[in-house]
Amino acid sequence: MGMLKNGIPSEATLCRMEQGIDDVSMAKKMSEFIALFRQELNTSGKQDIISIDGKAMRGTMQSNGRNPDIVSAYSGQTGLILATVACSEKSNEIKAGSVLLGELDIAGDIITADAMSMQKDIIDKIREKGADFVIELKANQRSLRYGIEDRIGRCKPLQEYTEGPELSHGRIETRTYKVYDGEALIVDKEKWGGRLTVVEVISETINKSTGVRSTERRFFVSSLPPNARR
């Protein structure tokens, strides 16, 4: 078609060209393009659920011998990865999550994340940008988690509903959700910049092949009101 008048570039030429690309600038431009594309897809203006998650990149290695960790923001409504940040250490995921949130337009959306994101600076960033959050609570916030466990038995849930049973991955699972006003459960409420809702999830699982039953109890903290639509 006359596009490559001097022939196909050699492998070495292509490698030199790729090595000359500023990967940070390229990632920034890609994020800008995806933000515009997301606006085009979301013409209805519906609330999006954005998941922040970190994954180790297998099959590649840094100079320190570790697999790099990539923290990404995924849009549940459009199916797009909105932005990514690479971390040299697992512990840097907290900082990377805050950087991601600073780059994204999340006003009116809901941010979901694992327990590592239950940090004051991340919560403040989400509230500051006009979004809500649902974040899992584990022992990394020990006083908060154990305080809720101590008090929750004396509180009545404002909402309670059950999903299942469902068969998945060889297990039959039934989940019960209990929604509480965090006012009575959280001691250091001022630290988190506003009202919080606590969600208790009780998963009862039966292994289909062995019949073994197990129960798991998890907690989530949210800025959404207790009566928010499911």
Which residue stretches match the model-derived regions?
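Active-site-proximal loop/turn and secondary-structure-junction residues that shape catalytic pockets
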Residues: 56-58, 117, 139-141
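Active-site- or DNA-interface-adjacent structural scaffold in DNA-acting proteins
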Residues: 4-63
